[in-house]
């Protein structure tokens, strides 16, 4: 039996830890538009160049979800397919993935396919994909993998820290005044993904050190006691070090992984931001 894990580019991972003929990973890219320029969030995207273009532009920026056909092409070729998308509250990606699932089953009624709305993005999606890989490599049945990943999702959370909000201001989601205040006062916005998949602001912290303290406080409120952590950062390895050191000082056995944000997550987290997934 062959397996495939399919995500959109709300997931930061570019590959699995151990890919094989029996287990493959496919990431279906969203597209990002800055003025008249289009950036496809695939392995060839120069994220630093995209971010430079974004900061040089005064025009509104947008993201577009993959088409059902793009998902359908990614689904084909395996007996068992597990699909995970960025939260359906922020993107039409989940709906495209659902339409493609229906088309696949019309083509091949014998394929096993399960679709997951991550209700999240970035680091939490990354944790979920890594757990999927682990479960599949255990040799579990399709039904058991679905059962266990559904239970695991109840134990994962997302917290984020934003150091810049230029994009939110350009797109009218924050006022220009608030954006200027955040920039001038070195404010960091700390928030989370709710259990409904919406993004909620938790705290405003002045400076990175206080933002790290706020993050630790908030994950402990959620029930964090040393579970796995995945930190996806946008050009800010320093904050990853600070968070890792703090977590390790409190929970020495915690397993912490870090990586760069995808184009999509960089687009919204902006320079200096992060999206951290963790287990409770």
From Swiss-Prot:
Q: Does the keyword Thylakoid apply?
A: no
Q: What is this protein called?
A: DegV domain-containing protein spyM18_1709
**Can you name one GO molecular function term for this protein?**
lipid binding
The record lists hexadecanoate as bound by 63, 91
NCBIfam families linked: DegV
Q: Domain DegV spans what residues?
A: 3-280
Q: Which UniProt keywords apply?
A: Lipid-binding
Q: Which organism is it from?
A: Streptococcus pyogenes serotype M18 (strain MGAS8232)
* Nucleotidyltransferase found in the keyword field: no
Q: Briefly state the protein's biological role.
A: May bind long-chain fatty acids, such as palmitate, and may play a role in lipid transport or fatty acid metabolism.
């Amino acid at each position: 039996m062959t397996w495939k894990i399919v995500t959109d580019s709300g997931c930061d991972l570019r590959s699995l830890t151990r890919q094989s003929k029996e287990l493959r990973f496919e990431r279906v890219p969203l597209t990002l538009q800055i003025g008249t320029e289009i950036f496809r969030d695939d392995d060839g995207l120069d994220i630093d160049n995209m971010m430079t273009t974004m900061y040089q532009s005064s025009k509104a920026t947008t993201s577009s979800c993959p088409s059902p056909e793009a998902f359908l092409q990614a689904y084909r070729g395996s007996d068992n397919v597990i699909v995970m998308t960025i939260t359906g509250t922020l993107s039409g990606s989940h709906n495209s993935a659902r339409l493609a699932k229906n088309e696949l089953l019309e083509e091949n009624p014998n394929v096993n396919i399960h679709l997951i709305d991550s209700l999240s993005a970035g680091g939490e999606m990354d944790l979920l994909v890594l757990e999927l890989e682990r479960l599949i490599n255990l040799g579990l049945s399709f039904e058991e993998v679905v059962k266990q990943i559904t239970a695991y999702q109840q134990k994962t959370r997302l917290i984020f820290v934003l150091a810049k909000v230029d994009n939110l201001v350009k797109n009218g989601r924050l006022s220009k005044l608030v954006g200027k205040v955040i920039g001038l006062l070195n404010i960091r916005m700390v928030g989370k993904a709710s259990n409904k998949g919406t993004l909620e602001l938790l705290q405003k912290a002045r400076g990175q050190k206080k933002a790290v303290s706020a993050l630790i406080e908030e994950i402990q409120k959620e029930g964090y006691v040393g579970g796995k952590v995945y930190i996806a950062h946008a050009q800010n390895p320093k904050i990853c070090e600070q968070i890792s050191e703090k977590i390790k000082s409190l929970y020495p056995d915690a397993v912490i992984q870090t990586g760069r944000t995808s184009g999509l997550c960089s687009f919204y987290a902006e320079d200096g931001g992060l999206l951290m997934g963790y287990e409770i």
